[in-house]
Amino acid sequence: MSMTPREIVHELNRHIIGQDDAKRAVAIALRNRWRRMQLPEELRVEVTPKNILMIGPTGVGKTEIARRLAKLANAPFIKVEATKFTEVGYVGRDVESIIRDLADAALKLLREQEMTKVSHRAEDAAEERILDALLPPARMGFNEDAAPASDSNTRQLFRKRLREGQLDDKEIEIEVAEVSGVDISAPPGMEEMTSQLQNLFANMGKGKKKSRKLKVKEALKLVRDEEAGRLVNEEELKAKALEAVEQHGIVFIDEIDKVAKRGNSGGVDVSREGVQRDLLPLIEGCTVNTKLGMVKTDHILFIASGAFHLSKPSDLVPELQGRLPIRVELKALTPGDFERILSEPHASLTEQYRELLKTEGLGIEFQPDGIKRLAEIAWQVNEKTENIGARRLHTLLERLLEEVSFSAGDLAGAQNGEVIKIDADYVNSHLGELAQNEDLSRYIL
Protein backbone atom coordinates (compact mmCIF):
# COMPACT_ATOMS: atom_id res chain seq x y z
CA MET A 1 0.00 0.00 0.00
CA SER A 2 2.10 2.94 -1.25
CA MET A 3 -0.67 5.46 -2.03
CA THR A 4 -0.03 8.96 -0.69
CA PRO A 5 -2.66 10.61 1.56
CA ARG A 6 -3.66 12.85 -1.36
CA GLU A 7 -4.25 9.80 -3.60
CA ILE A 8 -6.23 8.04 -0.84
CA VAL A 9 -8.49 11.09 -0.40
CA HIS A 10 -8.93 11.33 -4.18
CA GLU A 11 -10.03 7.68 -4.28
CA LEU A 12 -12.43 8.17 -1.35
CA ASN A 13 -13.91 11.21 -3.14
CA ARG A 14 -15.09 8.88 -5.92
CA HIS A 15 -17.51 7.24 -3.47
CA ILE A 16 -18.12 9.67 -0.60
CA ILE A 17 -19.23 13.31 -0.79
CA GLY A 18 -17.78 15.89 1.62
CA GLN A 19 -16.34 15.02 5.06
CA ASP A 20 -12.83 16.16 4.05
CA ASP A 21 -11.51 16.23 7.64
CA ALA A 22 -12.43 12.58 8.23
CA LYS A 23 -10.95 11.53 4.89
CA ARG A 24 -7.68 13.32 5.65
CA ALA A 25 -7.45 11.70 9.10
CA VAL A 26 -7.95 8.15 7.82
CA ALA A 27 -5.65 8.77 4.83
CA ILE A 28 -2.83 9.89 7.15
CA ALA A 29 -3.46 6.91 9.47
CA LEU A 30 -3.24 4.51 6.52
CA ARG A 31 -0.11 6.13 5.11
CA ASN A 32 1.54 5.99 8.54
CA ARG A 33 1.18 2.21 8.45
CA TRP A 34 3.22 2.11 5.24
CA ARG A 35 5.77 4.56 6.72
CA ARG A 36 6.11 2.37 9.81
CA MET A 37 6.91 -0.70 7.71
CA GLN A 38 9.87 1.19 6.16
CA LEU A 39 11.48 1.75 9.58
CA PRO A 40 14.23 -0.44 11.12
CA GLU A 41 12.89 -3.35 13.19
CA GLU A 42 13.85 -1.91 16.61
CA LEU A 43 12.06 1.39 15.89
CA ARG A 44 9.10 -0.21 14.10
CA VAL A 45 7.88 -2.02 17.22
CA GLU A 46 7.78 1.29 19.11
CA VAL A 47 5.50 3.07 16.61
CA THR A 48 1.84 2.38 17.40
CA PRO A 49 -1.14 3.51 15.32
CA LYS A 50 -3.04 6.64 16.35
CA ASN A 51 -6.61 5.40 16.76
CA ILE A 52 -9.48 7.56 15.52
CA LEU A 53 -12.83 8.63 17.00
CA MET A 54 -15.38 9.78 14.40
CA ILE A 55 -18.19 11.95 15.74
CA GLY A 56 -21.18 12.74 13.58
CA PRO A 57 -24.88 12.08 12.94
CA THR A 58 -26.11 8.90 11.29
CA GLY A 59 -25.96 8.57 7.50
CA VAL A 60 -23.13 11.06 6.83
CA GLY A 61 -20.49 8.51 5.75
CA LYS A 62 -18.67 7.27 8.89
CA THR A 63 -19.03 3.57 8.12
CA GLU A 64 -18.57 4.03 4.37
CA ILE A 65 -15.23 5.83 4.86
CA ALA A 66 -13.88 2.94 6.97
CA ARG A 67 -15.22 0.30 4.55
CA ARG A 68 -13.71 1.98 1.48
CA LEU A 69 -10.43 2.50 3.34
CA ALA A 70 -10.10 -1.22 4.10
CA LYS A 71 -10.83 -2.06 0.46
CA LEU A 72 -8.15 0.41 -0.68
CA ALA A 73 -5.59 -1.00 1.75
CA ASN A 74 -6.54 -4.59 0.88
CA ALA A 75 -6.25 -5.21 4.62
CA PRO A 76 -8.15 -7.46 7.05
CA PHE A 77 -11.16 -5.41 8.14
CA ILE A 78 -14.08 -5.98 10.46
CA LYS A 79 -16.99 -3.77 11.47
CA VAL A 80 -18.65 -4.40 14.82
CA GLU A 81 -21.32 -2.66 16.91
CA ALA A 82 -20.27 -1.82 20.45
CA THR A 83 -23.79 -2.62 21.66
CA LYS A 84 -23.38 -6.32 20.73
CA PHE A 85 -20.86 -6.91 23.51
CA THR A 86 -21.16 -7.38 27.27
CA GLU A 87 -18.68 -7.29 30.12
CA VAL A 88 -16.65 -10.47 30.64
CA GLY A 89 -18.54 -12.82 32.96
CA TYR A 90 -22.00 -11.90 31.68
CA VAL A 91 -24.05 -13.68 29.02
CA GLY A 92 -23.18 -12.31 25.58
CA ARG A 93 -20.16 -11.84 23.35
CA ASP A 94 -16.95 -10.63 24.93
CA VAL A 95 -14.76 -8.09 23.12
CA GLU A 96 -11.95 -10.60 22.39
CA SER A 97 -14.23 -12.18 19.78
CA ILE A 98 -13.57 -9.01 17.68
CA ILE A 99 -9.96 -10.13 17.17
CA ARG A 100 -11.03 -13.74 16.51
CA ASP A 101 -13.42 -12.49 13.81
CA LEU A 102 -10.66 -10.28 12.39
CA ALA A 103 -8.38 -13.34 12.21
CA ASP A 104 -11.10 -15.23 10.29
CA ALA A 105 -11.47 -12.28 7.90
CA ALA A 106 -7.69 -12.19 7.32
CA LEU A 107 -7.54 -15.93 6.63
CA LYS A 108 -10.42 -15.67 4.15
CA LEU A 109 -8.85 -12.65 2.39
CA LEU A 110 -5.43 -14.28 2.04
CA ARG A 111 -6.87 -17.64 0.99
CA GLU A 112 -8.73 -15.91 -1.86
CA GLN A 113 -5.52 -14.13 -2.91
CA GLU A 114 -3.45 -17.34 -2.82
CA MET A 115 -6.10 -19.30 -4.71
CA THR A 116 -6.15 -16.60 -7.39
CA LYS A 117 -2.36 -16.97 -7.75
CA VAL A 118 -2.60 -20.73 -8.35
CA SER A 119 -5.82 -20.55 -10.40
CA HIS A 120 -4.10 -21.40 -13.73
CA ARG A 121 -2.44 -24.51 -12.32
CA ALA A 122 -5.68 -25.53 -10.60
CA GLU A 123 -7.60 -25.01 -13.86
CA ASP A 124 -5.21 -27.32 -15.75
CA ALA A 125 -5.34 -30.02 -13.05
CA ALA A 126 -9.15 -29.83 -12.89
CA GLU A 127 -9.39 -30.11 -16.67
CA GLU A 128 -7.31 -33.30 -16.63
CA ARG A 129 -9.52 -34.85 -13.92
CA ILE A 130 -12.70 -34.03 -15.84
CA LEU A 131 -11.22 -35.52 -19.02
CA ASP A 132 -10.27 -38.67 -17.09
CA ALA A 133 -13.90 -38.97 -15.98
CA LEU A 134 -15.24 -38.29 -19.48
CA LEU A 135 -12.97 -40.75 -21.30
CA PRO A 136 -12.78 -44.44 -20.35
CA PRO A 137 -9.31 -45.91 -19.68
CA ALA A 138 -7.36 -46.98 -22.77
CA ARG A 139 -8.20 -50.54 -23.84
CA MET A 140 -5.25 -52.84 -24.42
CA GLY A 141 -5.46 -54.48 -27.82
CA PHE A 142 -3.26 -56.11 -30.46
CA ASN A 143 -2.13 -52.83 -32.00
CA GLU A 144 -0.72 -51.22 -28.86
CA ASP A 145 1.25 -48.50 -30.71
CA ALA A 146 -1.84 -47.10 -32.46
CA ALA A 147 -3.94 -46.94 -29.26
CA PRO A 148 -2.06 -44.10 -27.48
CA ALA A 149 -2.13 -41.91 -30.60
CA SER A 150 -5.85 -42.50 -31.04
CA ASP A 151 -6.54 -41.80 -27.34
CA SER A 152 -4.46 -38.62 -27.49
CA ASN A 153 -6.46 -37.33 -30.46
CA THR A 154 -9.75 -38.13 -28.71
CA ARG A 155 -8.55 -36.40 -25.53
CA GLN A 156 -7.59 -33.25 -27.46
CA LEU A 157 -10.99 -33.25 -29.17
CA PHE A 158 -12.78 -33.53 -25.81
CA ARG A 159 -10.49 -30.86 -24.31
CA LYS A 160 -11.50 -28.46 -27.11
CA ARG A 161 -15.20 -29.20 -26.59
CA LEU A 162 -14.81 -28.81 -22.81
CA ARG A 163 -13.18 -25.38 -23.18
CA GLU A 164 -15.89 -24.25 -25.60
CA GLY A 165 -18.60 -25.25 -23.12
CA GLN A 166 -20.16 -27.92 -25.36
CA LEU A 167 -19.99 -30.53 -22.58
CA ASP A 168 -21.36 -28.32 -19.76
CA ASP A 169 -24.67 -30.19 -19.45
CA LYS A 170 -23.22 -33.70 -19.76
CA GLU A 171 -23.45 -35.73 -16.54
CA ILE A 172 -20.35 -37.51 -15.24
CA GLU A 173 -19.40 -39.52 -12.18
CA ILE A 174 -16.36 -38.14 -10.41
CA GLU A 175 -14.60 -38.55 -7.06
CA VAL A 176 -14.50 -35.35 -5.03
CA ALA A 177 -13.42 -34.56 -1.49
CA GLU A 178 -16.15 -35.15 1.04
CA VAL A 179 -17.37 -31.97 2.70
CA SER A 180 -17.10 -32.57 6.42
CA GLY A 181 -18.41 -29.26 7.72
CA VAL A 182 -20.46 -29.73 10.89
CA ASP A 183 -22.72 -26.85 11.86
CA ILE A 184 -22.50 -26.30 15.60
CA SER A 185 -24.65 -23.69 17.29
CA ALA A 186 -23.52 -22.36 20.65
CA PRO A 187 -24.62 -19.61 23.03
CA PRO A 188 -22.95 -16.17 22.77
CA GLY A 189 -19.50 -16.08 24.30
CA MET A 190 -18.68 -19.69 23.33
CA GLU A 191 -17.37 -18.89 19.83
CA GLU A 192 -13.84 -20.13 20.58
CA MET A 193 -15.02 -23.57 21.72
CA THR A 194 -17.36 -23.81 18.71
CA SER A 195 -14.49 -22.99 16.34
CA GLN A 196 -12.26 -25.66 17.93
CA LEU A 197 -14.99 -28.31 17.63
CA GLN A 198 -15.61 -27.42 13.97
CA ASN A 199 -11.87 -27.72 13.23
CA LEU A 200 -11.80 -31.10 15.00
CA PHE A 201 -14.65 -32.49 12.87
CA ALA A 202 -13.16 -30.99 9.71
CA ASN A 203 -9.79 -32.70 10.37
CA MET A 204 -11.50 -36.04 11.06
CA GLY A 205 -12.98 -36.07 7.56
CA LYS A 206 -9.87 -34.79 5.78
CA GLY A 207 -8.77 -36.78 2.74
CA LYS A 208 -12.01 -38.74 2.39
CA LYS A 209 -13.34 -39.01 -1.17
CA LYS A 210 -16.88 -39.47 -2.33
CA SER A 211 -18.15 -40.45 -5.78
CA ARG A 212 -20.80 -38.02 -7.06
CA LYS A 213 -22.84 -37.61 -10.22
CA LEU A 214 -22.58 -34.03 -11.44
CA LYS A 215 -22.92 -31.99 -14.59
CA VAL A 216 -19.55 -31.13 -16.14
CA LYS A 217 -19.93 -27.40 -15.41
CA GLU A 218 -20.59 -28.01 -11.68
CA ALA A 219 -17.90 -30.69 -11.44
CA LEU A 220 -15.30 -28.42 -13.06
CA LYS A 221 -15.90 -25.65 -10.50
CA LEU A 222 -15.84 -28.10 -7.58
CA VAL A 223 -12.67 -29.84 -8.75
CA ARG A 224 -10.99 -26.49 -9.56
CA ASP A 225 -11.58 -25.25 -6.00
CA GLU A 226 -10.38 -28.58 -4.61
CA GLU A 227 -7.16 -28.46 -6.68
CA ALA A 228 -6.54 -24.82 -5.74
CA GLY A 229 -7.00 -25.70 -2.07
CA ARG A 230 -4.48 -28.52 -2.46
CA LEU A 231 -1.91 -26.16 -4.01
CA VAL A 232 -2.20 -23.64 -1.16
CA ASN A 233 0.13 -24.27 1.78
CA GLU A 234 -2.14 -23.98 4.84
CA GLU A 235 0.66 -23.47 7.39
CA GLU A 236 2.25 -20.73 5.29
CA LEU A 237 -1.18 -19.18 4.77
CA LYS A 238 -1.86 -19.07 8.52
CA ALA A 239 1.52 -17.44 9.18
CA LYS A 240 0.81 -14.77 6.55
CA ALA A 241 -2.70 -14.20 7.91
CA LEU A 242 -1.33 -13.79 11.44
CA GLU A 243 1.13 -11.15 10.23
CA ALA A 244 -1.60 -9.40 8.20
CA VAL A 245 -3.86 -9.16 11.28
CA GLU A 246 -1.11 -7.85 13.55
CA GLN A 247 0.46 -5.38 11.12
CA HIS A 248 -2.41 -4.27 8.85
CA GLY A 249 -5.69 -5.15 10.62
CA ILE A 250 -8.41 -2.48 10.87
CA VAL A 251 -11.27 -2.69 13.39
CA PHE A 252 -14.24 -0.33 13.01
CA ILE A 253 -16.31 -0.06 16.21
CA ASP A 254 -19.66 1.56 15.48
CA GLU A 255 -22.15 2.98 18.01
CA ILE A 256 -19.45 3.60 20.62
CA ASP A 257 -21.69 6.38 22.00
CA LYS A 258 -24.28 3.78 23.02
CA VAL A 259 -21.89 2.35 25.63
CA ALA A 260 -21.05 5.77 27.06
CA LYS A 261 -22.50 6.64 30.46
CA ARG A 262 -25.22 9.21 29.85
CA GLY A 263 -25.01 12.36 31.94
CA ASN A 264 -25.20 11.76 35.68
CA SER A 265 -27.05 8.43 35.61
CA GLY A 266 -26.02 6.38 38.63
CA GLY A 267 -25.14 2.69 38.88
CA VAL A 268 -22.99 0.49 36.67
CA ASP A 269 -24.49 -0.80 33.44
CA VAL A 270 -23.25 -4.20 32.23
CA SER A 271 -23.62 -3.22 28.58
CA ARG A 272 -21.88 0.13 29.01
CA GLU A 273 -18.98 0.91 31.30
CA GLY A 274 -17.93 -2.74 31.54
CA VAL A 275 -17.63 -2.97 27.75
CA GLN A 276 -15.51 0.20 27.68
CA ARG A 277 -13.19 -1.25 30.34
CA ASP A 278 -12.85 -4.48 28.35
CA LEU A 279 -12.04 -2.52 25.18
CA LEU A 280 -9.14 -0.71 26.89
CA PRO A 281 -6.53 -3.54 26.82
CA LEU A 282 -7.63 -4.51 23.30
CA ILE A 283 -6.99 -1.00 21.95
CA GLU A 284 -3.89 -0.40 24.09
CA GLY A 285 -2.35 -3.72 23.07
CA CYS A 286 -2.82 -7.23 24.43
CA THR A 287 -2.59 -10.84 23.24
CA VAL A 288 -5.67 -12.76 22.10
CA ASN A 289 -5.84 -16.48 21.39
CA THR A 290 -7.26 -17.21 17.89
CA LYS A 291 -7.27 -20.11 15.43
CA LEU A 292 -4.16 -18.53 13.83
CA GLY A 293 -2.33 -18.54 17.16
CA MET A 294 -1.66 -15.72 19.62
CA VAL A 295 -2.47 -12.33 18.05
CA LYS A 296 -0.88 -9.16 19.44
CA THR A 297 -3.21 -6.17 19.04
CA ASP A 298 -0.53 -3.46 19.53
CA HIS A 299 -0.48 -2.39 15.87
CA ILE A 300 -4.11 -2.96 14.86
CA LEU A 301 -5.81 0.31 13.86
CA PHE A 302 -9.06 0.98 15.74
CA ILE A 303 -11.60 3.44 14.35
CA ALA A 304 -14.53 4.13 16.69
CA SER A 305 -17.60 6.10 15.67
CA GLY A 306 -20.80 7.39 17.17
CA ALA A 307 -23.53 9.98 16.72
CA PHE A 308 -23.30 11.17 20.37
CA HIS A 309 -26.88 12.52 20.37
CA LEU A 310 -27.67 11.57 23.97
CA SER A 311 -24.11 11.58 25.29
CA LYS A 312 -20.80 13.38 24.71
CA PRO A 313 -17.35 11.98 23.89
CA SER A 314 -16.32 13.16 27.38
CA ASP A 315 -18.86 10.64 28.81
CA LEU A 316 -16.58 7.79 27.71
CA VAL A 317 -14.25 6.56 30.45
CA PRO A 318 -11.11 8.78 30.47
CA GLU A 319 -8.76 5.88 29.68
CA LEU A 320 -10.72 5.07 26.49
CA GLN A 321 -10.72 8.73 25.46
CA GLY A 322 -6.93 8.70 25.77
CA ARG A 323 -6.66 5.65 23.53
CA LEU A 324 -8.61 7.41 20.73
CA PRO A 325 -6.36 10.48 20.31
CA ILE A 326 -7.49 11.62 16.84
CA ARG A 327 -10.97 13.11 16.87
CA VAL A 328 -12.83 13.98 13.70
CA GLU A 329 -16.21 15.65 13.52
CA LEU A 330 -18.36 14.80 10.50
CA LYS A 331 -20.80 17.48 9.42
CA ALA A 332 -24.53 17.04 8.85
CA LEU A 333 -25.49 16.94 5.16
CA THR A 334 -26.82 20.05 3.37
CA PRO A 335 -29.21 20.16 0.35
CA GLY A 336 -26.12 20.73 -1.81
CA ASP A 337 -24.50 17.57 -0.42
CA PHE A 338 -27.65 15.55 -1.18
CA GLU A 339 -27.59 16.89 -4.74
CA ARG A 340 -23.96 15.82 -5.18
CA ILE A 341 -24.62 12.39 -3.60
CA LEU A 342 -27.32 11.76 -6.20
CA SER A 343 -25.14 12.59 -9.19
CA GLU A 344 -21.38 12.61 -8.51
CA PRO A 345 -20.15 9.36 -6.88
CA HIS A 346 -19.09 6.31 -8.85
CA ALA A 347 -22.22 4.09 -9.13
CA SER A 348 -24.45 6.83 -7.67
CA LEU A 349 -28.02 6.03 -6.62
CA THR A 350 -29.52 7.57 -9.77
CA GLU A 351 -27.14 5.54 -11.95
CA GLN A 352 -28.06 2.34 -10.08
CA TYR A 353 -31.80 2.84 -10.67
CA ARG A 354 -31.21 3.80 -14.30
CA GLU A 355 -29.21 0.64 -14.97
CA LEU A 356 -31.67 -1.58 -13.06
CA LEU A 357 -34.61 -0.40 -15.18
CA LYS A 358 -32.55 -0.62 -18.37
CA THR A 359 -32.49 -4.41 -17.89
CA GLU A 360 -36.24 -4.36 -18.69
CA GLY A 361 -35.74 -2.14 -21.73
CA LEU A 362 -37.03 0.97 -19.94
CA GLY A 363 -35.01 4.17 -20.03
CA ILE A 364 -35.19 6.83 -17.31
CA GLU A 365 -33.26 10.08 -17.20
CA PHE A 366 -32.79 12.23 -14.11
CA GLN A 367 -32.89 15.93 -15.03
CA PRO A 368 -30.78 18.44 -13.01
CA ASP A 369 -33.91 20.22 -11.69
CA GLY A 370 -35.38 16.83 -10.66
CA ILE A 371 -32.21 15.92 -8.73
CA LYS A 372 -32.19 19.35 -7.07
CA ARG A 373 -35.84 19.04 -5.98
CA LEU A 374 -35.24 15.50 -4.67
CA ALA A 375 -32.28 16.76 -2.63
CA GLU A 376 -34.39 19.60 -1.17
CA ILE A 377 -37.17 17.20 -0.15
CA ALA A 378 -34.64 14.80 1.46
CA TRP A 379 -33.20 17.65 3.52
CA GLN A 380 -36.66 18.97 4.49
CA VAL A 381 -37.91 15.55 5.64
CA ASN A 382 -34.72 15.02 7.67
CA GLU A 383 -35.20 18.42 9.33
CA LYS A 384 -38.88 17.82 10.15
CA THR A 385 -38.55 14.21 11.32
CA GLU A 386 -35.56 12.07 12.32
CA ASN A 387 -32.30 13.03 10.60
CA ILE A 388 -31.06 9.79 9.02
CA GLY A 389 -28.67 11.49 6.60
CA ALA A 390 -28.10 10.11 3.11
CA ARG A 391 -30.16 6.99 3.90
CA ARG A 392 -33.24 9.19 3.41
CA LEU A 393 -32.47 9.22 -0.33
CA HIS A 394 -33.04 5.46 -0.55
CA THR A 395 -36.53 5.87 0.92
CA LEU A 396 -37.40 8.78 -1.36
CA LEU A 397 -36.12 7.14 -4.54
CA GLU A 398 -38.00 3.92 -3.82
CA ARG A 399 -41.18 5.93 -3.30
CA LEU A 400 -40.53 8.10 -6.37
CA LEU A 401 -39.94 5.17 -8.73
CA GLU A 402 -42.39 2.72 -7.14
CA GLU A 403 -44.92 2.89 -9.99
CA VAL A 404 -42.23 2.81 -12.69
CA SER A 405 -40.51 -0.21 -11.08
CA PHE A 406 -43.82 -2.06 -10.68
CA SER A 407 -44.91 -1.54 -14.30
CA ALA A 408 -41.47 -1.48 -15.97
CA GLY A 409 -42.25 -4.33 -18.40
CA ASP A 410 -45.52 -2.73 -19.59
CA LEU A 411 -44.05 0.77 -19.76
CA ALA A 412 -41.07 -0.40 -21.83
CA GLY A 413 -43.45 -1.52 -24.60
CA ALA A 414 -45.64 1.59 -24.36
CA GLN A 415 -42.73 4.07 -24.43
CA ASN A 416 -41.35 2.75 -27.78
CA GLY A 417 -37.76 3.49 -26.81
CA GLU A 418 -38.50 6.92 -25.33
CA VAL A 419 -37.00 7.69 -21.93
CA ILE A 420 -39.00 8.79 -18.89
CA LYS A 421 -37.69 12.16 -17.72
CA ILE A 422 -37.52 12.62 -13.94
CA ASP A 423 -37.73 16.41 -13.58
CA ALA A 424 -38.89 18.73 -10.78
CA ASP A 425 -42.56 18.43 -11.83
CA TYR A 426 -42.35 14.62 -11.77
CA VAL A 427 -40.76 14.71 -8.28
CA ASN A 428 -43.37 17.17 -6.97
CA SER A 429 -46.28 15.14 -8.34
CA HIS A 430 -45.01 11.95 -6.66
CA LEU A 431 -43.44 13.28 -3.44
CA GLY A 432 -44.51 16.91 -2.97
CA GLU A 433 -47.68 16.25 -0.96
CA LEU A 434 -46.03 13.63 1.25
CA ALA A 435 -43.09 15.95 1.99
CA GLN A 436 -45.37 18.88 2.92
CA ASN A 437 -47.60 16.82 5.22
CA GLU A 438 -45.50 16.22 8.33
CA ASP A 439 -47.71 13.42 9.67
CA LEU A 440 -47.53 11.51 6.38
CA SER A 441 -43.80 12.04 5.88
CA ARG A 442 -43.10 10.84 9.43
CA TYR A 443 -44.65 7.43 8.72
CA ILE A 444 -44.12 7.00 4.97
CA LEU A 445 -40.86 8.76 4.11
Curated annotation (Swiss-Prot):
One of its GO terms (molecular function) is ATP hydrolysis activity. It comes from the Bacteria. It holds the Pfam family AAA_2. Disulfide bonds: none annotated. NCBIfam families: hslU, PRK05201.1. A double ring-shaped homohexamer of HslV is capped on each side by a ring-shaped HslU homohexamer. The assembly of the HslU/HslV complex is dependent on binding of ATP. This is ATP-dependent protease ATPase subunit HslU.
